[in-house]
UniProtKB/Swiss-Prot annotation:
GO cellular component, one term: cytosol
Any one of the GO BP annotations: D-alanine biosynthetic process
InterPro entries membership: Ala_racemase (IPR000821), Ala_racemase/Decarboxylase_C (IPR009006), Ala_racemase_C (IPR011079), Ala_racemase_N (IPR001608), Ala_racemase_pyridoxalP-BS (IPR020622), PLP-binding_barrel (IPR029066)
SUPFAM superfamilies to which the protein is assigned, alphabetical: Alanine racemase C-terminal domain-like, PLP-binding barrel
Gene Ontology terms for molecular function: alanine racemase activity; pyridoxal phosphate binding
Listed name of the protein: Alanine racemase
HAMAP family xref list: Ala_racemase
CDD domains referenced in this protein's UniProt entry, alphabetically: PLPDE_III_AR_proteobact (cd06827)
Cofactor: pyridoxal 5'-phosphate
Length: 358
């Protein structure tokens, strides 16, 4: 019997999305970003499905070690870099690249005793002002890393965009110019483009692109949909109806009696709630897909359940499946109703949701 709720992960969708991104950036290698448990899709699931990617980007060392333990041989890059000097021997032992973005990391590299050098991607703060060395610091930092025996040569170079998901925002062009002027004529790889860069800013594609959300079939741009780019949703979040009830006009439903029926109808109770990662703040009208149609959430989402208005003439039965988002109901649409972004929805599913390859 299939578990409920479950996140069905489509390997063919993941492979399609990688192919689409390769076509978009045909001169670039692809660093598939699989941080946050593969954006909620399962770290090893995604890496195995995307085994033809040229490398994988991760946030934490533990994620990289899990991939190595799972047999992944491709290039791995820690996008936040290492945090402790004791991380450095692990990077060497498991052949893991690291971003360097801060003085403390440079000092640890200079002071370490390592069996071989570490591959470093120096992050430039071209305008996001979160991580990275500033343009004023760049020459000095680059010289220090070049002089450090624990740093493999050449040093690779990267930056990250603040507003690439706003295609009309000129700031991305400013960031590209800043980065390109600083790094002109230096050896090594360059990477600028995230998903939005790969899809909307072709001049940013560089030697490597670093797509994340687009690999999972989701557009990074609010109001857009992955399908507009040939992307296919990789996750179907599925549960089922555990009750179908006749409901009279004037009767409330759920905690706080938040919603009251304006007419006689039939309600369905779906076995998923905020304990599974479905947002408690999903408002009335947020769509759920049941038997080929959108039906609205009514009342408050509770820990284990939510309620939908099936309509007065509904013939839905207990046990029928309900799709919370996926191929028939884009996660971008659900996120817009809730007032969040698709990234948050797919990454916040809890361990109660079974993640399985479909």
């Amino acid at each position: 019997m299939k578990p409920f709720p479950r996140a069905e992960i489509s390997s063919s969708a993941l492979q399609n999305n990688l192919a689409v991104l390769r076509q978009q950036a045909s001169r670039s290698q692809v660093m598939a970003v699989v941080k946050a448990n593969g954006y909620g899709h399962g770290l090893l699931n995604v890496a195995n499905c995307l085994h033809t990617a040229d490398g994988f980007g991760l946030a934490r060392l533990e994620e990289a070690l899990e991939l190595r333990a799972g047999g992944v041989k491709a290039r791995l890059l820690l996008l936040e870099g290492f945090f402790r000097s004791t991380d450095l021997p692990l990077l060497v032992a498991h052949d893991i690249d690291t971003v360097v973005h801060h003085e403390s990391q440079i000092e640890m590299l200079e002071q370490a005793t390592l069996s071989k050098p570490v591959t470093v991607w120096l992050k430039v703060d071209s305008g996001m002002h979160r991580l990275g060395v500033t343009p004023e610091q760049f020459a000095q930092v680059y010289a220090r890393l070049t002089a450090c025996d624990n740093v493999a040569k050449p040093i690779h170079l990267m930056t990250h965009f603040a507003c690439a998901d706003e295609p009309e925002n000129h700031y991305t062009q400013v960031q590209m110019q800043t980065f390109n002027q600083l790094t002109a004529d230096l050896p090594g790889f360059r990477t600028l483009a995230n998903s939005a860069g790969a899809l909307y800013w072709p001049k940013s594609q560089g030697d490597w692109i670093r797509p994340g959300i687009a690999l999972y079939g989701v557009s990074p741009v609010t109001g857009d949909c992955g399908a507009n780019h040939g992307l296919i949703p990789a996750m179907n979040l599925v549960s089922r109806l555990i009750a179908v009830r006749d409901h009279k006009a004037g009767q409330p439903v759920g905690y706080g009696c938040y919603w009251t029926a304006k007419q006689d109808t039939r309600l369905g109770v779906v076995a998923i709630g905020y304990g599974d990662g479905y947002p408690r703040n999903a408002p009335e009208g947020t769509p759920v897909w049941v038997n080929g149609r959108r039906v609205p959430i009514v009342g408050r989402v509770s820990m284990d359940m939510l309620t939908v208005d099936l309509g007065a003439d509904a013939t839905d039965l207990v046990g029928d499946e309900a799709l919370l988002w996926g191929a028939a109901l884009p996660v971008e649409e659900v996120a817009e109703h809730i007032g969040t972004i698709a990234y948050e929805l797919v990454t916040k599913l809890t361990p109660r949701v079974a993640v399985c390859l479909a």
